[in-house]
Amino acid sequence: MKIFLLGGTKDSINIIEYIKNNYSAHILTTTTTEYGAKLAKEGGSDETLARPLPKDEIIEIIKNQDFDILIDATHPFAAHITQTSASIADELKMPYIRFERPTTNLENIDTSRIHYVKSFDEAGKLIEREFNQGNVLHFAGANTMEDIIKYVPCEKFYPRILKVPSSLEKCEKLGISEDHLIAMTGAASLEENIELIEKYDACVMITKESGEIGGVIEKIEAANQKDIAIIMIQRPQIKELNKNSIVSNLNELDIKLNSFFKKR
């Protein structure tokens, strides 16, 4: 059985490892970075493609290589990719699974310092209006910096990025100096987040509601301990998705996969 996996997340690595341990399957994983492809290969993916793929090219690959199922395990905020993948599966009449990581359980967490917004533009305006006196930690990826920089001076802006050429080029283009860049991979621990808040004398942190696997709880707890604000961008809602195609953990994924092909 051949699986076309849209990856680039920790979820996708977990999926690769689970499938290779439990099923007889060939997996092609697509990511937007060489780093993501490297992790997918290490996780057991048989093939990787490390570049953004337009819809027509994905369709061509799936048709030419006879893939049996399309799994979308991209980031919750990669809404356009999920919309595209669902459209492709519908067009090709092929099995489709969307792995949607659970939202963060904040039941026992102090959320009084969280300001929820629906977009990065809204986040930038909020900072300009209410948090313009201190420094800003941007823990929401290189692709979203431009919306914030419109409202925040570069000298007050400290983004956490992957140290890859595309991210470094974006920073240079936006005028963000190298000594403001926080190069890290993986979710930061509570201690690491506290250290970054202290080091850069931040008054506010920007993050996405990317789930526990994205380190959201550690960010909130660090902000609480250091008494700074958090601006949380809410997840986009994708209306095109059929709820029956969504799974949120490996057990649910297993049930779906079992309906398509047998375990080893």
Please state what every model-predicted region is:
Residues 4-43:
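N-terminal glycine-rich anion-binding loop in soluble enzyme alpha/beta folds
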Residues 28-52, 107-109, 170-174:
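N-terminal beta-loop-helix "entrance" segment that forms/cooperates
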Residues 31-37, 100-106, 142-144, 163-166, ...:
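Short, polar loop motifs at secondary-structure junctions
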Residues 43-62, 182-192:
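Glycine-rich, highly charged phosphate/nucleotide-binding loops
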Residues 59, 65-123:
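Glycine/small-residue-rich loop that forms an oxyanion/phosphate-binding "nest" at active or ligand-binding sites
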Residues 68-69, 135, 203-204:
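Structural motif
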Residues 139-181:
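Anionic-ligand binding region
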Residues 172-195, 200, 204, 209-226, ...:
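A C-terminal functional module that forms or caps the active site or interfaces directly
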